[in-house]
Swiss-Prot record:
Name recorded for this polypeptide: Putative phosphoenolpyruvate synthase regulatory protein
InterPro entries membership: Kinase-pyrophosphorylase, PSRP
Organism: Aromatoleum aromaticum (strain DSM 19018 / LMG 30748 / EbN1)
Record keywords: Kinase, Nucleotide-binding, Serine/threonine-protein kinase, Transferase
Domain of life: Bacteria
One Pfam family this sequence matches: Kinase-PPPase
Length: 277
């Protein structure tokens, strides 16, 4: 793989570039044997900026000795015209989909920059902020029984199994109110859920993780402690899984899963149909 040339990939947009980068990453991930250097170029909203971007792409082609790959979500025809003649693999992500949709729907698109993000922010921004605040206020078991009633989902699992980042991702991306609750040795000794969780069992979803990975994560937090020892991690993971099986809680091993995969699985499991913001 070290002999494989590095290809420079540009993500060009007249907005933030997030859409171009997200779609581009999904496509590039299908080529694990390739190596890429990624460059995001946002806010290319006039011809001068597009021509400057075209110059950067030409210089990169000369330096690399191979033409770059360009993912574009430009909708304004003026800056788009400044990039049409560059020596690169030019992937116009909007053109691939907008033209067929216009033909199918029988109407012209608005070609408005950032149109999707504007709609999302105007209708759902408040709900997303509320979900983020909820996740932060109900992290690591900091919840009363009454507050848990407002949760869309309650994540359970041992400490450092990925509950907090998943809760925040669900809030930011989907506006889901996610609380999380750590399973601790006292729960394992009782071999049952705390009362406040038991009353909301329908909202529970468990996260587990390989003991070796858990020990590695905990060592970074508390080096050479019993908390981080592989023996303790094995005990906690085994006890947590037994408890979740006994309580019939759906759970997922997060060891080799991305946060996107974990979140999608949770949404499907608890039947939450939410749009991505």
């Amino acid at each position: 793989m070290s002999d494989t040339p590095i290809r420079t990939v540009f993500f060009i947009s007249d907005g933030t570039g997030i859409t171009a980068e997200t779609l581009g990453h999904s496509l590039l991930a299908q080529f694990p044997g390739a190596r890429f250097r990624q460059v995001r170029v946002p806010f290319v909203d006039d011809l001068d900026k597009a021509l400057d971007c075209a110059r950067q792409i030409r210089e990169t082609a000369v330096t690399d000795g191979v033409r770059p790959i360009v993912f574009s979500t430009l909708v304004n025809p003026d800056p788009l015209s400044g990039l049409r003649e560059i020596d690169a693999l030019f992937v116009d992500l909007f053109e691939q989909f907008i033209n067929p949709l216009e033909a199918e729907l029988g109407q012209r698109s608005t070609h408005t920059v950032g149109r999707f993000h504007g709609i999302a922010e105007s209708s759902d921004y408040k709900a997303r902020i509320e979900a983020i605040n909820f996740a932060m206020a109900h992290d690591d078991g900091v919840s009363t029984d009454g507050e848990l009633a407002d949760a869309d989902v309650i994540l359970v699992g041992v400490s450092r199994s990925g509950k907090t980042p998943t809760s925040l991702y669900l809030a930011v991306q989907f506006g889901v109110k996610a609380a999380n609750y750590p399973l601790i040795p006292e729960d394992f000794e009782r071999n049952k859920l705390p009362g406040e969780l038991h009353r909301h069992r329908s909202k529970l979803f468990g996260l587990t993780i390989a003991p070796e990975r858990l020990s590695q994560i905990r060592q970074e937090r508390r080096p050479n402690s019993r908390y981080a020892s592989i023996e303790n991690c094995r005990f906690e993971i085994d006890a947590a899984q037994k408890l979740m099986r006994r309580e019939n809680i759906q759970w997922l091993d997060s060891t080799s899963k991305s946060i996107e995969e974990i979140s999608a699985t949770i949404l499907q499991a608890v039947r939450l149909n939410r749009p991505v913001y």
